[in-house]
Amino acid sequence: MTWDMANRKSETDIAESTWERARRRLSKTKPHALADRTWLLSGLEELDDSYKEYELSSDGEGLWYCSCYDHYGGEVRREEVCSHSAAVALYAGLPCQRTRPLKEKPKRLTPDWPCGIPGIPGKYSRWRPHQREAVELILRQWQSNGKYIALDAPTGSGKSLTAIAAAKLAGLKTVYCVVTKQLQEQIASDFPDAIVIWGRENYPCLRFTNTELTAGDCTHRKYSPCPKVNQCTYKSQKHRALAADLAVVNYSFFLNEANYVGGFSGWPVLVFDEADRAEGELMKFVSLTLTRQQLERCQIEPPEYKTKLDAWLKWAEPTLSKVGGELNRLEAGLEPYLEVEKEPPVELMRELIRYQRLHSKLKMFTTCVDARWVSELDDPEKWQFKPTFVRSFGHMLAEHGQRILAMSATMLSARDWAYNLGIEDEVTFHRVPSTFPRENRPVIHLPTADFSLKSANGEALMLMVRMVDGLLDKHKAQKGIIHAVSYKIAKYLLEHSRHQDRLISHSEAGTRAEALRRLIESEMPLVLVSPSFGRGVDLFGDRARFQICVKIPFPDLGDKQTAKRRWSGKAGERWYLLETVRAIVQMAGRIVRSADDWGVTYILDERWPRFYHQMERDFPLWFREACVW
């Protein structure tokens, strides 16, 4: 191999041919970070690389070290810059003036196969691409006392194994937090030593059998001890989870336990799976709903002006005092039964529970709710109160782990994630590349019409139907999904498409689950039309070979909380746009679920190019490289 030095302008300049080779490398592969200023770069046969991968490091000031100098022939390069170094320098935005032999290869912190880690099942016999490097990055951060790590890991990267392998290698007890019970069950299925614990309402009450009471209605108190407390299935499972090395919980349970009971607070490792939803889960936890039925059962009248937030703010404090007094009276009514060790009547315990729950809500109301909160007060049967932001409540999540690992396929920005949760410490951000060939998952723009609220009129909808029908002709033998984004668009399409015999929807099928089941099980090339299937749906293989995103999925400004947040300033605008990016990326991930899967995504909204270029840096690389213009 010869090295063209003719166009090298100075001793520290780099030949243009080297830069060209570097750019060719980046068009085919991307570096993968192993640690701070240390990377792994795949070799390319078409560039005459002799090895499958190269390890590189940099001092950050222009001096690079590359393992290619340790290979045969590397010594002839003297102090020339190799194209491996130039490529990584371009990718990382670092200076590059010299390349020298790699002094010391980064020490491997992981075994050659995952199941070599104690506690990892034998079925994990191979690391997925980039997975081992992600585990080692996490371990190095923990070794250097880094508390927060955010992992942006696309479908197929093996997030759960990455997190659990790192924790087991470090020998650290872990709370693994997910959104749904289904995901809890999936983790338990994959890792047999994981202990799942659900909320109290999922366990029966053994004290009052033959009633609808659950462990969520627990009446065990010092002043009213439950005679069956030692047999309680909830407490038994909770003790198992607390003693486990890996406890799997959902956000709702974790927030309640960590903040009010304390058993799952302070563990060495706290994993937030689907961490982009952590803010929303916290929002649900601190939001309040009061119902007319709940107040009437406790003989409480709502304020006279029920549609005014100010009236509720004035009403809350005296009402809390009144409910507290009644609660004291009910607790005193238990004493005669306890003195003779007799079980109190079920109805008395039910009434006590009702007052305890209302008292808890009112206490939260008087502590947190103020004029900055968003209120939904037009419904005569229920009244809702939500904060505009949850930054001031972020400690309810972030303070409960010694080390926090946040993971999502759509993390997008660690800085924004941390800001929205009130985290001010540094967060290490790592993006795992996708291993799915981009030619298997193209995202194609077919400009059809402007589907903004102002412009989505009859003409735009007719153009939409015409374009969708043409695509259904093209994919006549394949199943698919249409993300209508709005019910108006979904309804119009269902009523006017000439492919009505193939289209199914929630309303036609009965429920979301039923519509999805019909799509999956049918042998016909059905197409699911939905405004709300952009997340949490696994349509691998022939379940769906194409999907159509009709409209850019901006958050609904008809929602009072969304609107107030959107127009609150630059932070609100940034949140609004990033949520839209997240929704698009989530939609794109519904139909290609493995490296050998394939499917095409179409976007019809004319506004797509403008929005994409505005937010291009926030879209993950695996999405950007799939876009076809």
Regions found by a protein language model. Name each.
Residues 227-242, 260-261, 340-447, 510-512, ...:
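A contiguous, basic/glycine-rich beta-loop/short-helix subdomain that forms a polymer-engagement track
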